[in-house]
Amino acid sequence: MDKENSKQTAQPPVVDPARLKQLNLAIETLEKQFGKGSIMRLGDDSAVMHVKAISTGSMALDYALGVGGFPRGRVTEIYGPESSGKTTLALHAIAEAQKEGGIAALVDAEHAFDPTYARKLGVDINSLLVSQPESGEQALSIVETLVRSGAVDIVVVDSVAALVPQAELEGEMGDSVVGLQARLMSQALRKLTGAISKSSSVCIFINQLRDKIGVMYGSPETTTGGKALKFYSSVRLDIRRIAQIKDGEEVVGNRTKVKVVKNKVAPPFKIAEFDILYGEGISVLGELIDLAVEFGIIKKAGAWFSYGSEKLGQGRENVKRLLKEDETVRNTIRQQVRDTLTGTPTE
């Protein structure tokens, strides 16, 4: 018993003062050579322990990521099949960053940016920095310059598959270009990751899927650009359409599932589902209703929805219209959902 108590009350070992002096001298030398903050104790106030983030525009996905959105100072990869919502999700993140007063940049390697659609998602296109580079080297050089400036909060590259190496552009159609893009990405990410970490920028790479030839077991799907992006990404999101949303016979959107397949800032493998409506983006009200029903904040009996003693309406679309008009009820429900997601006790 005495031994157990002594173990519990044992003090950390005292470091030899001579060794401590030598360590402090070494730290001073490193800070003179490489700048203050090049090495620090994690217990110091100056050491950043909390990961800051920019919201994804989806409450469910913010929660699934564990830190409230896309982590700052990290590389994020969003990949999935065509028309699954990759660019839509990235544009929502840009809009959220701008709402907080941040500066956003889009490197449009696909040359397919639609300003009208971006505006509908809430993006301030007047302040958005857009570049449409001619080659992969130019695109990644632009990203590096923006990140190193320390003034940009979020940079989106759309997409990795469209980053064409200069050598491929200068060659003839049909020339063998095996491994050029993978080498380009590997070299660029080695330089970028440190700069992104120091600048606290969110850097999102949108990627496409390809099928590997001759795969007998396991998934034949792979992403473009080699393996470097998989390694350097702190977060990887797999986004898929799982169902169509119809208004009568007309398809008006898609039910979307996002799986966090890699996460170095929180536990991975969490899943978020939400609606993406054509011309509108993520259905914020639809997601709010789904989460509120899941958490028992809104009660559903048949087609009827009720909140407390108040009936909200019959059918999900009618409830969405009511919440759109009634700001007080909407904000109250949203706060309760947020409190449930974060584990904050509701008063």
From Swiss-Prot:
Transcription regulation listed as a keyword: no
Q: Which GO terms describe its cellular component?
A: cytosol
Which top-level group of life is the source organism from? Bacteria
Q: What UniProt keywords are attached to this protein's entry?
A: ATP-binding, Cytoplasm, DNA damage, DNA recombination, DNA repair, DNA-binding, Nucleotide-binding, SOS response
Keyword Metal-binding, does the record have it? no
HAMAP family (UniProt xref): RecA
Gene name as annotated: recA
Q: What is this protein called?
A: Protein RecA
Pfam families linked: RecA, RecA_C
The record's function comment reads: Can catalyze the hydrolysis of ATP in the presence of single-stranded DNA, the ATP-dependent uptake of single-stranded DNA by duplex DNA, and the ATP-dependent hybridization of homologous single-stranded DNAs. It interacts with LexA causing its activation and leading to its autocatalytic cleavage.
Cellular compartment(s)? Cytoplasm
**GO MF annotations for this entry?**
ATP binding; ATP hydrolysis activity; ATP-dependent DNA damage sensor activity; damaged DNA binding; single-stranded DNA binding
Q: Which family does it belong to?
A: Belongs to the RecA family.
Q: What are the binding positions for ATP in this chain?
A: 80-87
* Species for this entry: Chlorobaculum parvum (strain DSM 263 / NCIMB 8327) (Chlorobium vibrioforme subsp. thiosulfatophilum)
Against PANTHER family, the record matches this protein to:
MITOCHONDRIAL DNA REPAIR PROTEIN RECA HOMOLOG-RELATED, RECA
Name any Gene Ontology BP term: SOS response
